[in-house]
């Protein structure tokens, strides 16, 4: 019985490795799309196609942030103007949209991965596996210039927040 189990386990690992190889090959070729479409797009025949109503919301998020509106205020305004059918607009969702390269038409594959051995927990790819970046993969919803400005502002705001003292006695000892 243990021989049968060991053989079945090896077969399962072999199938998994073959599937991963096929996915990575499609990533290299620029033809791979994962299962989830980002907000603003729908998947049609392995293509990301803009959904115009959602694309307008994405553009609103970018334009608001570029004129100085913060992510908290953007989320609050989205909940007033564009309530979600299945929930609430959160600051984290706004930040993810602002940081996602898919909105300039690019795809960055294998930012995270699941290792072959146990425990099978998804982890950040810090060079363990190759990453693939495909430019102009699909129609952009915002310009590269807008995206780059937003990334600069996000980085600056993150640095400012880290340097703020949260207590009157911080750095006094």
Protein language model features and the residues they cover:
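Phosphate/pyrophosphate-binding and catalytic-coupling "lid/hinge/switch" segments at subdomain interfaces
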Residues: 1-45, 109
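Short, basic alpha-helical nucleic acid-contact segments in DNA-binding proteins
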Residues: 93-112
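Catalytic and ligand-binding motifs that coordinate phosphates/metal ions
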Residues: 23, 27-28, 76-79, 124-173
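Short, basic interhelical loop/turn and adjoining N-cap
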Residues: 79-93
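Surface-exposed extracellular loop regions of Gram-negative outer-membrane beta-barrel proteins
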Residues: 68-76
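Short helix-to-turn junction characteristic of helix-turn-helix DNA-binding domains
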Residues: 61-69
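Basic, short loop/linker segments at the boundary and entry of helix-turn-helix/winged-helix-like folds
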Residues: 44-60
């Amino acid at each position: 019985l243990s021989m049968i189990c060991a053989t079945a386990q090896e077969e399962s690992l072999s199938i998994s490795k073959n599937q991963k190889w096929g996915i990575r090959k499609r990533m290299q070729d620029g033809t791979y799309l994962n299962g989830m479409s980002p907000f603003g797009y729908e998947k049609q025949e392995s293509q990301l196609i803009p959904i115009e109503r959602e694309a307008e919301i994405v553009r609103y998020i970018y334009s608001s942030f570029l004129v100085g509106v913060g992510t908290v205020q953007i989320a609050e305004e989205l909940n007033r103007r564009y309530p979600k059918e299945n929930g609430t607009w959160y600051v984290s969702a706004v930040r993810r949209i602002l940081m996602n390269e898919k909105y300039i038409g690019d795809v960055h594959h294998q930012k995270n991965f699941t290792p072959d051995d146990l425990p099978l927990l998804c982890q950040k790819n810090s060079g363990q596996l190759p990453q693939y970046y495909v430019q102009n993969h699909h129609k952009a919803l915002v310009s590269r210039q807008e995206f780059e400005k937003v990334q600069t502002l996000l980085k600056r705001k993150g640095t400012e927040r880290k340097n703020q003292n949260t207590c009157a006695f911080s750095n006094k000892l």
